[in-house]
Amino acid sequence: MASLRKTHPLIKIANDALVDLPTPSNISAWWNFGSLLGLCLITQILTGLFLAMHYTSDISTAFSSVTHICRDVNYGWLIRNIHANGASFFFICIYMHIARGLYYGSYLYKETWNIGVVLLLLVMMTAFVGYVLPWGQMSFWGATVITNLLSAVPYMGDMLVQWIWGGFSVDNATLTRFFAFHFLLPFIIAAATVIHLLFLHETGSNNPIGLNSDADKISFHPYFSYKDLLGFVIMLLALTLLALFSPNLLGDPENFTPANPLVTPPHIKPEWYFLFAYAILRSIPNKLGGVLALLFSILVLMVVPLLHTSKQRGLTFRPITQFLFWTLVADMIILTWIGGMPVEHPFIIIGQIASVLYFALFLVLFPLAGWLENKALKWA
């Protein structure tokens, strides 16, 4: 008789996804980030739940409630530090996961890839509304600046901004709804993750050489379950070290000051993981143009599968595109640096060049290099 895990309607689903899943035998550590993202999501939902038990979403008490969590709640300081720094690890894993997808041509699984881009947008949205909740100076002014961007929408912009604010400025109504969104979105992310996996398991995983691996598959458990476990240990160790030794390393000192609508901070900037997009936004002098560039800096990922010209899937055997890939990585680092710098010479021009290069790589240089490599191999 077949075992329960293969027959039980519910356990069978988990078995097919986590135990008996046929997996390419040669996938490297770059394939660990999917499960690490799952771990990040679970960690964030759990720590967030415990924070929500003590947090109050009212402008008169929000800041003090966070102080109360850190001072008076049992291990509240730890829960808060893990939650705040867990967001940074979430984005590190997301960017690594996307980079892996770009490098090895995983984007050719179009449904999985597009759901992934939607997931990225959802996570970015969640992080943004979450950053507003402590109601510090950078929370308030970050919310003001970013929500104000919607006023660039023609005809209905101003109405849209006031609708999101729930008034004529970022105020109590804004904080309350942002808390509601911040609580709800992670569960939508969890649901979208299930769809992401559903589409992935329709095709199976890609692998480093980009060839069909049906002839050489091994079961997920115990091989990759233990490999994932090693990744979990490394990431949790790194997160714990950051949360215990330098919890404020990645935060903004402005956020230790309660929100004050009458005092604007000298430099308004988002958390480090949004700086690249912020740099692209700022590099265009026109408001609507900047907003569109900001939006397209993420949505450009959706056109990557359509612009794939190479006869090979990944970049393992494609040196020209490899060079362009690492140029993209360097470009992202430069944009991140520029996003945190004041708007003055030479940062303005560096940001503009880096922004043009960012879009040129995705829309022109990658497809061109793929075509060129086909020609070089006489495959075209």
Swiss-Prot record:
Where can this protein be found?
Mitochondrion inner membrane
Q: How does it sit in the membrane?
A: Multi-pass membrane protein
Q: Where do the annotations place heme b b566 binding?
A: H97, H196
Query: What cofactors does this protein use?
Result: heme b
| Record's keyword annotation contains Acetylation | no
GO molecular function ontology, one term from the record: metal ion binding
Chain sites annotated for binding a ubiquinone: H201
Q: How is the cofactor bound?
A: Binds 2 heme b groups non-covalently.
User: What residues does heme b b562 bind to?
Assistant: H83, H182
| GO BP, one annotated term | mitochondrial electron transport, ubiquinol to cytochrome c
Membrane-crossing ranges are: 33-53, 77-98, 113-133, 178-198, 226-246, 288-308, 320-340, 347-367
Give the chief site where it resides.
mitochondrion
> What's any one GO cellular component for it?
mitochondrial inner membrane
Function, in words: Component of the ubiquinol-cytochrome c reductase complex (complex III or cytochrome b-c1 complex) that is part of the mitochondrial respiratory chain. The b-c1 complex mediates electron transfer from ubiquinol to cytochrome c. Contributes to the generation of a proton gradient across the mitochondrial membrane that is then used for ATP synthesis.
Q: What else is known?
A: Heme 1 (or BL or b562) is low-potential and absorbs at about 562 nm, and heme 2 (or BH or b566) is high-potential and absorbs at about 566 nm.
Xref: PANTHER family: CYTOCHROME B
Instruction: Please give the family membership noted in the entry.
Output: Belongs to the cytochrome b family.
| Description of how the protein assembles with itself and partners | The cytochrome bc1 complex contains 3 respiratory subunits (MT-CYB, CYC1 and UQCRFS1), 2 core proteins (UQCRC1 and UQCRC2) and probably 6 low-molecular weight proteins.
Q: What is the protein name stated in its UniProt record?
A: Cytochrome b
> Source organism lineage?
Eukaryota, Metazoa, Chordata, Craniata, Vertebrata
